[in-house]
Amino acid sequence: MSSKPEPKDIHQPNGTGPTPSPCSSDGPGREPLAGTSEFLGPDGVEVVVIESRANAKGIREEDALLENGSQSNESDDVSTDRGPAPPSPLKETSFSIGLQVLFPFLLAGFGTVAAGMVLDIVQHWEVFQKVTEVFILVPALLGLKGNLEMTLASRLSTAANIGQMDTPKELWRMITGNMALIQVQATVVGFLASIAAVVFGWIPDGHFSIPHAFLLCASSVATAFIASLVLGMIMIGVIIGSRKIGINPDNVATPIAASLGDLITLALLSGISWGLYLELKHWRYIYPLVCAFFVALLPVWVVLARRSPATREVLYSGWEPVIIAMAISSVGGLILDKTVSDPNFAGMAVFTPVINGVGGNLVAVQASRISTFLHMNGMPGENSEPTPRRCPSPCTTFFSPDVNSRSARVLFLLVVPGHLVFLYTISCMQGGHTTLTLIFIIFYMTAALLQVLILLYIADWMVHWMWGRGLDPDNFSIPYLTALGDLLGTGLLALSFHVLWLIGDRDTDVGD
């Protein structure tokens, strides 16, 4: 019969490779192969066909995950190309996770140390003394690395891991769309952060200055725009390079985003605000002109972001987490403003970027890894787990045998040795205004451990919760988590300094 070879041609490309069976030689039993419900052979044959399809499917998925550039060009249906229980995205041990995370973590930490040293110096500048609302901008703008750059890194890492950046055309579309998107977000968030700084500075004191408000707006928007442009380009290079040398971008992209993010952003904020402050007495019209220039560029970035399907949805629906995260970080900025403005707590400035940066870096790595794991198994809104996930217990988050729990343990264990290295570096550089006594280190480490413990637990719950409601965690979870890291870090550090002051540890002259 002419229809005999057709079933073979259909099954062989899918990897089934059928072997001869009693039924295959039976002519009448072959015709119904198009529909298994009419198959006349024994049940065992039907099971073998189904299992071989699943196995071939699993092989294709694992090859796509573990080999660089091995994505098939076949236009398989995504909905049917996933098995019910696909393998883990990456075969990683605790040692391999720690080895890949360690160097970027230390690099990011030294970046936060440098940012802390910068903040420790610029807090004595006239612009920070006269316009103290600039302190409120610090966590909000440093948080842009969580709102924008880390979200960008997580999106691109996921896209690279699932093969959406394998061809030059896909790569270029992903780059242009995402760069335009973060410029739109940076401009809007910078403007809103300045409004929050003005409001938070006006409410406690009841004092409002229009020139200072324009200064904050121009400084915030210019800093956000330039920092996002520079860091976005760095992130793209890091992710492309990671894929080429066989490193999981999830482990390195987000920490490297933060390694230079804090330093570049804080240096830009200090330099721009100082330069604009010098013009306050001579040419006040420069402030509205700076704001108008960056606002005029918005339509260009919007058009470019709308052209890419990967960023079009985020352009319309991705504002809520970014804006709320900015507001949360601004509350942390208010705490920083009220604490650092007190000469008794001047030593807090150098440690704030460090504790906030380390906590945000670690939780961003974990959120990006969980998000990639979920993307490997389905699409947002699909429940790939046998039982629906509720609020997890701490034991499930930190002590279960799965790869995400393993990475949570590794990241948590990095906190103490990492902070000890960073504190020692600050001490060697004669930074800060606080002597690193044993009691101070104990209080500082307690605050850092508590911050990361809470963040990792919230990340485990939040990423799965957003996934179950059809929200992409790459776009929604990291802004919330890094903003919470800023708030928790600043709040716990301020509490530690107040307790140390109450019990008699009142060093404020170190580094003067």
Swiss-Prot record:
What keywords tag this UniProt record? Cell membrane, Ion transport, Magnesium, Membrane, Phosphoprotein, Repeat, Transmembrane, Transmembrane helix, Transport
Q: Localized where?
A: Cell membrane; Basolateral cell membrane
What does the UniProt induction comment state?
A: Up-regulated in heart, brain, kidney and down-regulated in liver by low Mg(2+) diet.
The family database entries (Pfam families) matched by this protein are listed as: MgtE
Q: List the disulfide bonds.
A: none
**Per the database entry, which stretches of residues form a coiled coil?**
none
Q: Which GO terms describe its cellular component?
A: basolateral plasma membrane; protein-containing complex
Q: Where is the composition biased (Polar residues)?
A: 13-24
Q: How is it modified after translation?
A: Phosphorylated.
The organs and tissues expressing this protein are described as: Expressed in heart, brain, kidney, liver and colon.
Compositional bias (Basic and acidic residues): 1-11
Listed GO biological process terms? cellular response to magnesium ion; intracellular magnesium ion homeostasis; magnesium ion transmembrane transport; metal ion transport
Q: How does it sit in the membrane?
A: Multi-pass membrane protein
Which residue ranges does the record annotate as region Disordered?
1-40, 60-90
Q: Which reaction does it catalyse?
A: Mg(2+)(in) + 2 Na(+)(out) = Mg(2+)(out) + 2 Na(+)(in)
Q: Which GO terms describe its molecular function?
A: inorganic cation transmembrane transporter activity; magnesium:sodium antiporter activity
- SUPFAM superfamilies recorded for this chain? MgtE membrane domain-like (SSF161093)
Q: Which residues cross the membrane?
A: 101-121, 184-204, 221-241, 256-276, 285-305, 315-335, 345-365, 410-430, 438-458, 483-503
Q: What does this protein do?
A: Na(+)/Mg(2+) ion exchanger that acts as a predominant Mg(2+) efflux system at the plasma membrane. Transporter activity is driven by the inwardly directed electrochemical gradient for Na(+) ions, thus directly depends on the extracellular Na(+) ion concentration set by Na(+)/K(+) pump. Generates circadian cellular Mg(2+) fluxes that feed back to regulate clock-controlled gene expression and metabolism and facilitate higher energetic demands during the day. Has a role in regulating the activity of ATP-dependent enzymes, including those operating in Krebs cycle and the electron transport chain.
Q: Which PANTHER family match?
A: DIVALENT CATION TRANSPORTER SOLUTE CARRIER FAMILY 41, SOLUTE CARRIER FAMILY 41 MEMBER 1
Name it: Solute carrier family 41 member 1
